Amino acid sequence: MLDHKAEGPPAFRAPPLACDAHFQVFGEPARYPYASPEPLRYAPPVAPLPDYLDLAAHLGIERFVFVQPSAYGEDNACMLDAMREVGIGRCRGIVDVHEDVPDATLARMDALGVRGVRINYSPVKPRIDGFSASMLPRIRRLEARCQELGWHLDFLGPGWLTAELLPTLASLKVPFS
């Protein structure tokens, strides 16, 4: 990790209650193995929570939104452990879950500060005829689950997929990004 302290104090300090609205932690692979159905697009370096918190404190960032990395698939353990450590007063989270995840699991996630579900598809995924249509049942089911909890949907995917999903996105009954 870059030794930010060797560089001295930052030229600009974040204002009080500043929030990093999208960051990810990567734990030791032996404890948090990558779980991707496809080969990983990149090999994430270990990026533990203490290193990030140290940098955030140096910059004056007090609050955080954890976003589930695609490298972990639907295994949110690393992120949820980090959220437990930080505490609900300082963080929120966006998970990747199967549309049929048990209500009790979602309730536990909500209690930790989770407020959204991420639908992850590789941003470099080649266009496949009918793929966006095949996603619609999952999107609608996750939309319903999010609506029950007051959560939002977060999408990661290639531009062609976003373009094909625009009519669906416009009709969602939950916020999305």
Locate each region found by the language model.
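Catalytic pocket-lining loop regions of alpha/beta-barrel enzymes
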Residues: 132-177
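Mid-domain alpha/beta scaffold segments of enzyme catalytic cores
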Residues: 2-149
